[in-house]
């Protein structure tokens, strides 16, 4: 339980964040789908994620009752292209394709707070920070 309450944030170079919900419409409603079906879909969803173990770390925050979205998904990796690959593959699984609602996706470079000023300085370029 402690790991869920206080997740360790990995020291990767890139992060991705997006909010998400499960659909509650008249035609498709995640919460009225029988629990065994939801469990099967989430197991299949998790199997896709496990293929990325070791390259992507995921931290899910529950925000039901605190925000307009039910969850916040944080992904951490040293290669930002892996986010695209993972998200692309997951969009075709049943849980995401039929029931997932996604907000805006944000991808960024992590940097120490002490470097923020130089990143925002005129004349600075990504190359001056080691990016090609």
Report residues per predicted region.
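Flexible phosphate-binding patches that engage nucleotides and nucleic acids
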Residues: 87, 91-131
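Short, glycine- and small/hydrophobic-rich beta-strand elements in well-ordered beta-sheets
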Residues: 44-70, 86, 97-112
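Generic "edge-of-domain/loop-turn" microfeature
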Residues: 25, 80-82, 111-112
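Short S/T/G/P-rich N-terminal loop/turn motif that feeds into the first structured element of a domain
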Residues: 1-47, 78, 117-132
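Short, well-ordered beta-strand segments in beta-rich or mixed alpha/beta enzyme
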Residues: 15-20, 65-81, 85-90
